[in-house]
């Protein structure tokens, strides 16, 4: 095991030594302007970084530098989405924290008033290979995807990328992600921590990480999810009790009786967006043909009410139109190998791949290690997500047995309660009121306030 780790570090070192540090390579990745983009004052870069030469594995990135007057003083923030198999460009960049939003036609971009690039230089990475524009020349690689290889190749990417962008070496660096990135983020942070301990003067100045609605611990995630369904009146008492009777949440695999109980309970939900249980789900025009006039009218009324608050449940569809446009791909230096499939928000080759090689049951041992290492760690949870709900996260965090520094209190976003928070020794937990699975998408102002407090290392405001 030690020899394997040493060989990996030597490979990373070789990658660093052979990567070009020339301005030319960086300039080749510069985006002059994206199709339909409003005029902006910040720089953008995108392109590929090879993470495995022999197999032809390359990861695609998009850097949007800070819009502040002094981007060179702002930290670098890497954003990762989960799945596994979902694109950080589709979700993180285009729906959540990036500087642009995509119009309904997929033709134009408009500014996100709550973009996180006011506070940091944002690096979006499509990982692992097979996600978005990231690719491999070896088809069998899809059968070898897993947590360990993803973490290793994300580290290789970062070191090689920093040789292309040397101005970000030693810059304060943070990793943020959501959902299954609850695995990716702490696992990458652990790899960086190990790498930094192995070398003098390491180039990645990791300060901390933050995860939202994260997968943390399989047993507690399962129990917390069922509890949320029942406590939020999504399932009946009978369904809840049937699940408790037939399901062993500590088992590696559920029994047939448990699967059946969960299947029956899911029918209690109705046709809702499970990632945001109180907002309307996306209903594309072609799906409205079987609706009555009254149903169509009510759908339009409900959607209009939420759109006035800048919420649109169909934004994922607009991204798939925009990023498949040839002129957009040319502007982003993407798909230069003519990948034989369309760009999608979530990749079938990864998302539907039952051959995902390894997925740790619990991230809690990594949390304990990195808390002891002194990293800044925040965990936040949108309280209307039923897929990885706040109850699951609270159960998981409870297993860490951390000492409470600042007891539970409401924090404010403007003149409204933004959520609640509790501060522990080595970790801060935050709920975001009225937010679903993608917190910055549903509550952009609150999410930006959350980011500012995280980067500053300050507790969230108790008053407005």
Swiss-Prot record:
Cleavable signal peptide: 1-22
Annotated S-S bridges: 86-346, 247-258, 282-314
Entry keyword Aminoacyl-tRNA synthetase: no
Main location as per UniProt: secreted
Statement: the UniProt record of this protein carries the keyword Hydrolase: yes
Sugar-modified residues: 52, 113, 137, 290, 335
Its EC number(s): 3.4.16.-
InterPro entries reported in the protein's UniProt record: AB_hydrolase_fold, Peptidase_S10, Ser_caboxypep_his_AS, Ser_caboxypep_ser_AS
Enzyme class, first EC level, given as a word: hydrolase
Known tissue expression: Expression not detected.
SUPFAM superfamilies: alpha/beta-Hydrolases
Keywords, alphabetical: Carboxypeptidase, Disulfide bond, Glycoprotein, Hydrolase, Protease, Secreted, Signal
Active site: 179, 385, 437
Pfam families per UniProt: Peptidase_S10
Subcellular location field: Secreted
UniProt GO MF annotations: serine-type carboxypeptidase activity
Similarity section: Belongs to the peptidase S10 family.
Record protein name field: Serine carboxypeptidase-like 22
Species: Arabidopsis thaliana (Mouse-ear cress)
């Amino acid at each position: 095991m030690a020899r394997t780790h040493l060989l990996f570090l030597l490979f990373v070192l070789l990658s660093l030594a052979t990567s070009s540090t020339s301005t030319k390579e960086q300039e080749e990745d510069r985006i002059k302007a994206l199709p339909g983009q409003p005029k902006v004052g910040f720089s953008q870069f995108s392109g590929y970084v090879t993470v495995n030469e022999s197999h032809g594995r390359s990861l695609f990135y998009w850097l949007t530098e800070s819009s502040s007057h002094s981007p060179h003083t702002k930290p670098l923030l890497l954003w990762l989405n989960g799945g596994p198999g979902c694109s950080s460009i589709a979700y993180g960049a285009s729906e959540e924290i990036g500087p642009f939003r995509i119009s309904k036609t997929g033709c134009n971009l408009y500014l996100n008033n709550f973009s996180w690039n006011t506070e940091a230089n944002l690096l979006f990475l499509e990982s692992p290979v097979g996600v978005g524009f990231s690719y491999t020349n070896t088809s069998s690689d899809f059968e070898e995807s897993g947590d360990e290889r993803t973490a290793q190749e994300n580290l290789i990417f970062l070191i090689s990328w920093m040789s292309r962008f040397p101005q970000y070496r030693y810059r304060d660096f943070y990793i943020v992600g959501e959902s299954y990135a609850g695995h990716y983020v702490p696992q990458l942070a652990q790899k960086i921590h190990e790498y930094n301990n192995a070398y003098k003067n390491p180039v990645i100045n990791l300060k901390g990480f933050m995860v939202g609605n994260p997968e943390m611990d399989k047993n507690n995630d399962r129990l917390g999810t069922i509890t949320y369904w029942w406590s939020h009146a999504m399932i009946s008492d009978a369904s809840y009790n049937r699940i408790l009777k037939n399901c062993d949440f500590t088992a590696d695999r559920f029994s047939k009786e448990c699967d059946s109980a969960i299947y029956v309970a899911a029918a209690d939900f109705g046709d809702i967006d499970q990632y945001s249980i109180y907002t309307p789900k996306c209903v594309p025009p072609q799906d409205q043909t079987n609706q009555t006039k009254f149903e169509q009218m009510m759908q339009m009324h409900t959607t209009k009410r939420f759109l006035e608050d800048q919420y649109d449940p169909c934004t994922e569809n607009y991204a798939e139109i925009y990023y498949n446009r040839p002129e957009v791909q040319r502007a982003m230096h993407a798909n230069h190998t003519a990948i034989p499939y369309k760009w999608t928000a979530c990749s079938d080759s990864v998302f539907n791949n039952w051959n995902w090689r390894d997925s740790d049951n619990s991230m809690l041992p990594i949390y304990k290690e990195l808390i002891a290492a002194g990293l800044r760690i925040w965990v936040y949870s949108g309280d209307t997500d039923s897929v990885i709900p706040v109850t699951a996260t609270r159960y998981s965090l409870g297993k860490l047995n951390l000492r409470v520094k600042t007891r539970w209190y409401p924090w404010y976003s403007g003149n409204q309660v933004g959520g609640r928070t509790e501060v522990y020794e080595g970790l801060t937990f935050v709920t975001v009121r009225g937010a679903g699975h993608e917190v910055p998408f549903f509550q952009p102002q609150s999410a930006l306030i959350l980011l500012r407090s995280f980067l500053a290392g300050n507790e969230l405001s108790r008053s407005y």
